[in-house]
Amino acid sequence: MTFLQRLQGLADNKICAFAWFVVRRFDEERVPQAAASMTFTTLLALVPVLTVMVAVASIFPVFDRWSDSFVSFVNQTIVPQGADMVFDYINAFREQANRLTAIGSVMLVVTSLMLIRTIDNTFNRIWRVNSQRPWMMQFLVYWALLTFGPLSLGVGISFMVGSVQDAALASGAPQWSGALRTAATLTFMTLLLWGLYRFVPNRFVPARQAFVGALATAFCLETARSLFTWYMGNFDGYRSIYGAFAAVPFFLLWLNLLWTLVLGGAVLTSSLSYWRGEAFRRGFDSRGRFDDVLKILLLLDAAQKEGKALPVQEFRRHINMGYDELGELLEKLARHGYIYSGRQGWVLKTGADSIELNELFKLFVYRPLPVERDHVNQAVDAVMTPCLQTLNMTLAEFDAQAKKQQQS
């Protein structure tokens, strides 16, 4: 077997082809650049976020020990072993921030909300979301993350750590407490990432796909943290170069790696919807887009006749495409008044006998220029005009014609 034949065999393999699809999306979404931007934003907003979160927790004395668990969790996750000095500085800055005036406190809250908004925008870009949540809904979500987020984390971490210690003591093998603690941290990190991937994007994300992406990312994060700690413990040549500041560049490198893995997990999660029906092999070109639009409208027309709405996942049972591509088409059809989103799902706004195929073709494939055109534009219009005239039929007429051809 030649080398080219082996490459062709890899391309035909479903797992290899899907892995290459994820790598391409990782590059298309410019994850390394986004991770670098998130690193800088985190560096600026980390102290304000911790200050606001701990300040909210301190309002309720019963949550004091849980807020300490949250801070310890942040220390273990964000600051790798060997860069502990950085977290000492962060704690010192946080204590100084507690002495700020009212205006300074407001700026802390604003800076914290900016970090969460940056995360929200980055996730929505990965899921290719065009329509953002209403600003009031965004504010409520961001504020809930700042207030209830650390409390939930603290409660969960305290519960898990206590359970691990009890299990180790009950088994008579306290030496297993380290492994059990790692398993508990991995479990909790998976749940945290699952919540991010499932609810942060303004797009439907199946719970199972969010869990797979979160589990893979949590394993990568734990492995990276172990390797990072091992390197810093066994190769200390960097200390002779940076001296007392050695922890700072490694802290920045770790933050960058952390965000690269988290955003890479988001790319993986958003790509999992392409696995079914090998949708990752097809190209999302104008022809495919037009065909998918017709399928969407025909499904909605059939649902309308039965008096029901269609949830997003129902479309995926009939059309092989990812949820982000599907969401783009649904949002565009909604913007142009063909469909709308109700509580139960998507609904056709008008009847199939009122939808013209040539208008859909102009919307999704080719639209003649309304302004003054040169000879090339005029020649293209002359070629396309017969095509548009051929499409001068309604969706109902097209459906009847398609069924007739299927029967013959």
Swiss-Prot record:
This is UPF0761 membrane protein NMC0462. It comes from Neisseria meningitidis serogroup C / serotype 2a (strain ATCC 700532 / DSM 15464 / FAM18). The chain crosses the membrane at residues 43-63, 100-120, 139-159, 176-196, 210-230, 248-268. GO terms for cellular component: plasma membrane. It is found in: Cell inner membrane. PANTHER family: INNER MEMBRANE PROTEIN YHJD (PTHR30213), UPF0761 MEMBRANE PROTEIN YIHY (PTHR30213:SF0). Belongs to the UPF0761 family. Its main location: membrane. It is a multi-pass membrane protein. Keywords: Cell inner membrane, Cell membrane, Membrane, Transmembrane, Transmembrane helix. Pfam families: Virul_fac_BrkB. NCBIfam families: PRK04214.1, yihY_not_rbn. The keyword Transcription does not apply. It comes from the Bacteria.
